[in-house]
Amino acid sequence: MTEAYISLLIGDGYLPGALYLANRIRQFDNERDLVILVSDISIKVHRLLERFYSKVVVLLPDSKIATSPYNAPELHLLNRPDLENVLNKIHIFHQTHYEKLLYVDLDVLILNDFKGLFDIEVKEWELYAVSDIGWPDYFNSGLMLFKPSANVFRHLLALLTEVPGVSYDGGDQGLINYVFQNKWLRTGDDTKRCGVWYNLSFAFNMTLSNNYESLPSVLRNLTDIKLVHFIGIVKPWMLKPSFVNDFPDGSLDSFVAQWWEQFSSFENGEFLPLVFKNVESERIEEDSHETEEKVDEEVSISEPQDETTDFKYQFGHHSFEEPAPVLDYSTEGEAWKLNEEQLTNQWDVDAPAEPLPVPVEEDEREETKAEAELEELLPDIVQPEPPAPHVFPWEAYNEKPTRVFHDYR
């Protein structure tokens, strides 16, 4: 078969996602190969992957790409040190023994069959993907349909050393976006960008968001969603099956619960336990002879935790606490939690001082002095009696007559 699904596993921590992806795809597609590129995994995990993947391709030490020398500042902005080795994803473009590959990240929930993407005609230097929720002019590299090419691979590799900060996020997504730009945004004066990106429906790679517009959009298109992508550091296998954290109003069943429901059905529940014991065997290296030895032991799996106990997930070398549920603050307005520093001037807290005298012009001073002297010289004037109050309101508006007609009677 010249078409295949492909993914990437760096370290043992994403093993649950790798097991989920292989078993879930096999439920709707038994014809195409399942390929996974691996690095820094234990021998036991390697043997387990061989049970479910058509090919397990080990990235040799001298071919691995480290992010740090290239895009450390950009990666630091994401605050995701766990993505330090994600640039190794570009090795998927070097699997030229396939005519067409569909890359899928391991942190996904598959709701519907999406093998129809293989019907798309794709050429070298073309890529089909879904817009990224963070900046839709870029695509999300969690799902990509493309034609493998040694030319594309070498071009991506060269850009890492030739163009400082070529990846806007320090990882594979920024680098691949630099080459495969949206056809509507392409400019003819940039020779560094050789590929073209064609946008797929958001239903093929839906990333969750707490944006107030997200829930109505998801509800309207729920039956069309093919794949849910759990972006961020917390993955579904790190949470309880009963964890609800997708939409605060409970309009949807938890996607995390759906992931666990599917996961528990694989291999008669063999992978159901929530906590996997640490696998501390030696890593697979280029000159390791242990990779050829027979390993009879399978990955040991502990009993599921009681959901009534305090929850803590441990796998590999990482430990995660269950995050607090997402609360709905959409009615609070923008920046309602902004802790803005309040500055208080010293004169605002002291007792108020005496008001300053109002400045008076020189002419006004002379006029006031003359009036005072005149009042001393004038005799006291007897004020007349005030007029009697009016009986009717209109009497106050009577005008003094200016003409008088004599009465000759």
Swiss-Prot record:
Its main location: cytoplasm. UDP-alpha-D-glucose binds at L8, Y14, R80, K89, D105, D107, N140, S141, D169, D172, Q173, G232, K235. Residues 283-303 are annotated as: Disordered. It holds the Pfam family Glyco_transf_8. UDP binds at L8, Y14, R80, D105, D107, H229, G232, K235. GO terms for biological process: glycogen biosynthetic process. Disruption phenotype: Disrupts glycogen biosynthesis. GO terms for cellular component: cytoplasm; vacuole. Keywords: Cytoplasm, Glycogen biosynthesis, Glycoprotein, Manganese, Metal-binding, Transferase, Vacuole. It catalyses: L-tyrosyl-[glycogenin] + UDP-alpha-D-glucose = alpha-D-glucosyl-L-tyrosyl-[glycogenin] + UDP + H(+); [1,4-alpha-D-glucosyl](n)-L-tyrosyl-[glycogenin] + UDP-alpha-D-glucose = [1,4-alpha-D-glucosyl](n+1)-L-tyrosyl-[glycogenin] + UDP + H(+). Its cofactor is Mn(2+). Glycans are attached at Y212. Its EC number is 2.4.1.186. The record marks K89 as: Important for catalytic activity. It is found in: Cytoplasm; Vacuole. Glycogenin participates in the glycogen biosynthetic process along with glycogen synthase and glycogen branching enzyme. It catalyzes the formation of a short alpha (1,4)-glucosyl chain covalently attached via a glucose 1-O-tyrosyl linkage to internal tyrosine residues and these chains act as primers for the elongation reaction catalyzed by glycogen synthase. This is Glycogenin. The gene is GLG1.
